[in-house]
Amino acid sequence: MPYIPPEHRPPLDEHIDRLAAALVREAQTLPGEAAVAGLLNYALTRLILKVVQLRFGAWRYWLIALVTGVLHNVAQELYRRVAAAYEEEQRRRHGDVEGFAASGPDQPEA
């Protein structure tokens, strides 16, 4: 969960803002809107590898589980906060997919 205490945010935010600006600048030199995906993947991978190297030195199973769990939680929280609202708006705008309403938890049992 990304909700760290407020006093821990400013020292990180200035670096995050600079990295984000650098990623956007680099993405603008590449063809296609989706080119930013590779840059984000690279930046996140390098950040994780560097933090593990500086803090722990070597990978251990518990650390692999911890890092992959964090990445999984990041994806889930982003989906919950951003994608779910977007998808719900599209469902309202364009209509539901046939079959979801009939099999959803809000339907009475037959």
What feature does the model see in each segment?
Residues 1-110:
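Solvent-exposed interaction surfaces and binding hotspots enriched for charged
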